Design a protein with these regions (language model features):
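N-terminal type II signal-anchor transmembrane helix
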Residues: 1-68, 106, 126
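Non-catalytic, structured segments within soluble enzyme domains
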Residues: 39, 128-268
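Flexible, acidic/glycine-enriched loop-and-adjacent beta/alpha segments
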Residues: 87-137, 193-194, 200
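Short, solvent-exposed loop/turn elements at domain surfaces
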Residues: 74-77, 107-109, 224
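Terminal hydrophobic membrane-targeting helix
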Residues: 46-98
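Residue-level signature of transmembrane alpha-helical entry/exit and packing/kink sites
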Residues: 23-27, 93, 155
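Short, glycine-/polar-rich solvent-exposed loops and beta-turns at beta-strand/coil boundaries
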Residues: 58-59, 78-79, 111-117, 134-135, ...
């Protein structure tokens, strides 16, 4: 007597029969794969269109025409931009560190794009909290020299690619020097050396921690934090910078308290 046996196979789940968690997982995986493919295709299209950045290594900013007396005292200048160029080794460490504390604390650690900063900015945006921006010094150099400020995905992607390219071609010190000599700081002053003269009437090397903090607060919004036109907003921004400088170990407790109490003499 023989027994008839039937093949019993596992039922195939249709999409409608799949549990919700599995559907979500498939959708997320598909979305991630599509996003990655789109990103790679965008990079392949945009990278050949990036501008030549080799000239940055030999950067020479345009200088205004200056008029001096016979004994070397400047009595005037011509040009829309006021600027003094300083090589990296002549920019005081205090000024460099003050700027990095508020603009890009991980500058010497990231490759041009700070993913930790990006994630921090996303979290802050989701929780409606204010934080420092996610753009690095290198990204700001890329934007200042080569790009517009239009807020499009393609422009942001170009900025990221340019930042990686610049980091590959230049040293960190070269990039920081470019930024500190080129950035606009209000009152027609470009670069920190010129800003020190414009706002305080002294060379960059003579600035106190309080004065360095005032200048370091300008790149974010030079019109809003201009110490001549908006002394109260400039003071508030300076206090934020001093707090960052103290938190990053740029200044100690005594210097922090002294800088907060210092009354600055700003040129009118």
């Amino acid at each position: 007597m023989s027994e008839n046996t039937e093949d019993v196979s596992s039922p195939v789940l249709t999409w409608a029969d799949r549990p919700l968690w599995m559907k979500c997982l498939w959708i997320l995986a598909g979305g991630a794969a599509f996003g990655l493919l789109s990103l790679l295709l965008s990079i392949a299209v945009l990278y050949p269109q990036l501008p030549d950045t080799s000239g940055l290594a030999h950067y020479q900013p345009k200088q205004p025409l200056r008029v001096y007396t016979a004994d070397g005292v400047e009595i005037g200048g011509f040009g829309n931009e006021k600027r003094q160029y300083l090589p990296f080794d002549q920019i005081p460490k205090l000024m460099r560190d003050s700027l990095l504390a508020v603009e890009d604390a991980r500058f010497y650690e990231h490759p041009g794009i700070d993913m930790i900063g990006v994630l921090r900015a996303i979290v802050a945006n989701l929780t409606h909290r204010r934080t420092q921006g996610a753009s690095t010094i290198t990204q700001q150099v890329a934007r200042t020299f080569f790009l517009t400020r239009e807020k499009t995905i393609s422009r942001k992607l170009k900025e990221a690619l340019l930042s990686l390219k610049i980091e590959h071609e230049l040293s960190k010190d070269q990039i920081l020097a470019l930024y500190m000599n080129q950035i606009y700081l209000g009152a027609r002053a470009y670069g920190f050396a010129e800003a020190a003269q414009t706002y305080f009437g002294k060379p960059l090397s003579a600035l106190s921690p309080a004065e360095c903090a005032m200048l370091a607060g300008l790149p974010q919004n030079p019109a809003n934090a201009n110490p001549i036109r908006s002394p109260e907003r400039a003071r508030n921004r300076q206090l934020v910078v001093l707090m960052r400088m103290h938190g990053q170990g740029v200044i100690d407790d005594a210097q922090y308290e002294s800088a907060k109490a210092e009354k600055l003499s700003v040129r009118a």
